[in-house]
């Protein structure tokens, strides 16, 4: 992300209000694409539903199905996202670009198979109709490829291409939704298909961008699986962070204010709407991290580590460390202050602004919104500190902080269900506070003796960690090689093909007629 941050930084050098708004718009979309796209699509579709007079029950079911599909796809990809990003960075550093596209399709294949089985089982018992279930599964698979592609797209630094695919997805989805409503199609099914088509356009656009920048090759698509074993803490960090961010929503659905929409599809409008709007307040920190914290910190970080790699003297290393940590402390302080100002401003104005909107906010919802604004603000700053921990390869600290975030947020939210409804948002707030404090303390202790961490905590002999994922990659390589050998040799591969060959040989061909 630092690379694309430098590209976006050029936009911020342009003067004028419009140029500044344009720069923040680019940065916001690039940095928070998945969730922001989900929010904007849902809002756009709901506006069309309101204008067309779609029933409230159908609107609620549509929102639940899209929300479930969005959260399920983000949770699955969160386990693979960081190791895949690390694999991508390593391949680019080693100038092995021919490994990138095969790994993209290999990672997609693993996630699509696992996700289709798991989410398909849920949909089977969810109470959705066959068509609704198939549409949800279709949308789920498209989302997986999109979220996985986001990791690869940041490497090409084409923020305009990302923006165009983003805008095309929203435009196509809204146009298809309008056409479905005008044709009188069933609203839930028609709008689900429209959203899937919108995400499908984004998928096709992103794949074209990837094929434009990376070479095609016949390298193994399963090489990246070794990185899952090698960097399992990264996978767990991504998963725990995602669980901490979204688990409280699911737990609230099972509480007293939860509403059963249909079958296993639940919602809690009094809590979900404030949470959705409060989540948008972290955009400032997400954008600031990419265009300010990383852009200003990374050059100092690079210079410091280059002194170790290129034989720098002790005096230069000490000076470079002081400059790097001073820059880091300054940027983190500014980042926290910006988030504090945004959170305070939003809380101050929310009663006036939200009451004027047709969202049906009551006193309980206003309370949830204020609580969740503080919680998401703490999460945003804590996540920034977590990413800096990953810069210093403190994977254990990252797993500890994210694991406590997921555990405390989930457990505290479950306990809050036993209390008055006014306290429901405090579970997530407590988890976010623990996340922020633990990550900050870990960063402080880790950087207090940085040369020791770099020189003395590394293994003397480099070893490759192998495990279940590495073995899975080897098995898939053997299967693929066997398949390819049969294809080249002309032998039928499947039972269906063998049956066709037997029928052909019996009635029309000879034994040597391949």
Predicted regions and their residues:
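N-terminal membrane topogenesis motif
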Residues: 1-42, 60, 64, 225-234, ...
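Hydrophobic faces of transmembrane alpha-helices in multi-pass small-molecule transporters and flippases
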Residues: 20-36, 163, 220-247, 332-341
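Small-residue-rich midsections of specific transmembrane alpha-helices
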Residues: 63-89, 242, 246, 275-300
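Alpha-helical transmembrane segments of multi-pass membrane proteins
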Residues: 67-72, 108-112, 121-153, 342-350, ...
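Specific pore-lining/lateral-gate transmembrane helices of multi-pass inner-membrane transport
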Residues: 92-104, 272-356
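Alpha-helical transmembrane segments of multi-pass membrane transporters/permeases
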Residues: 153-179, 389-411
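Hydrophobic alpha-helical transmembrane segments
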Residues: 165-211, 422-445
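Transmembrane helical elements of multi-pass membrane transporters/channels
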Residues: 194-198, 202-294
